Amino acid sequence: MNFGRVLTAMVTPFTDEGELNYDEAARLADYLATHGSDGLVVCGTTGESPTLTWQEEYELFRVVRDAVAGRAKVIAGTGSNSTREAIEATKKAAQLGLDGSLQVVPYYNKPTQAGLYEHFKAIAQASDLPILLYNIPSRTGASLQPETVAQLAELETVVAIKEASGMMDVASEIRRLTPSRFAIYSGDDSLTLPLLSLGGSGVVSVASHLVGLQLQELIQSYIRGQHDQALAHHLRLFPLFKVLFIETNPVPIKAALEMQGWRVGRARLPLAPLQPSSLQVLRQVLEEMGLLAESKGSEQMATKVS
């Protein structure tokens, strides 16, 4: 399974009352599929999966699937710190005809490497849906070691990893130990270019909500051997990469999308809105990069109607 180069970790839109805004989710998915995203990761970290019910997630999977209509891969965030839950959710995603599943390292219960291997192996054996492993120790409290990744890469349906430890030594060791068919995606926009130099395939991106086409050009420039051009793209986008993590993700990206006219709403509690000082910095970066020049989403539709 080739998921592509730019996979957008899609936000989950909410109404003012905090309910799922499925209509806006469909509009956003449609937009992303035509603006640089090869795939959409639905209900991952950026999609606020810890605050969603499984029924909300399943309906969102269906809505996004229908909205992109085959123009982009749809990868379901069906990971859990309960192996049984992860299996059940992954089977449901497969029944819905999605293209893959994102399987986060189990959080809170801090399993050993042996436990992590058995967890992912059980999911892989329960469904034919291709698996994108997700290593993010800063959030889970446990790290999937390169040797364990290499073991898992021997399983037919374990095809890739979203490596978000932020450590290039870890990515290097994963690349050294796994076959070339096993894809490594950066879990941080700012590390996309460095990871490409280590044999990475692309990025699971937050910034691609705003600059998907530019991220594609960064990656394609590198692949074409135009490394100076790729670096120029990276440096131009770098302030955006950093400001989108000025506070806990996905709070800044949702604020940025709201500024553009998307009705994605606030993050659900316990995540709080951006502090005024952070909001000011975010707006300044977006204005400097010309990302607030035209309205998008529901606001754009309202303007056209009027």
From Swiss-Prot:
The keyword Cell division does not apply. The active site is at 134 (proton donor/acceptor), 162 (schiff-base intermediate with substrate). Belongs to the DapA family. Pathway: Amino-acid biosynthesis; L-lysine biosynthesis via DAP pathway; (S)-tetrahydrodipicolinate from L-aspartate: step 3/4. The record marks 45, 108 as: Part of a proton relay during catalysis. One of its GO terms (cellular component) is cytosol. Its EC number is 4.3.3.7. One of its GO terms (biological process) is diaminopimelate biosynthetic process. The keyword Lipid biosynthesis does not apply. Its main location: cytoplasm. The gene is dapA. Keywords: Amino-acid biosynthesis, Cytoplasm, Diaminopimelate biosynthesis, Lyase, Lysine biosynthesis, Schiff base. SUPFAM superfamilies: Aldolase. HAMAP family: DapA. InterPro entries: Aldolase_TIM (IPR013785), DapA (IPR005263), DapA-like (IPR002220), Schiff_base-form_aldolases_AS (IPR020625), Schiff_base-form_aldolases_CS (IPR020624). Pyruvate binds at residues 46, 204. Catalyzes the condensation of (S)-aspartate-beta-semialdehyde [(S)-ASA] and pyruvate to 4-hydroxy-tetrahydrodipicolinate (HTPA). This is 4-hydroxy-tetrahydrodipicolinate synthase. Homotetramer; dimer of dimers. It catalyses: L-aspartate 4-semialdehyde + pyruvate = (2S,4S)-4-hydroxy-2,3,4,5-tetrahydrodipicolinate + H2O + H(+).
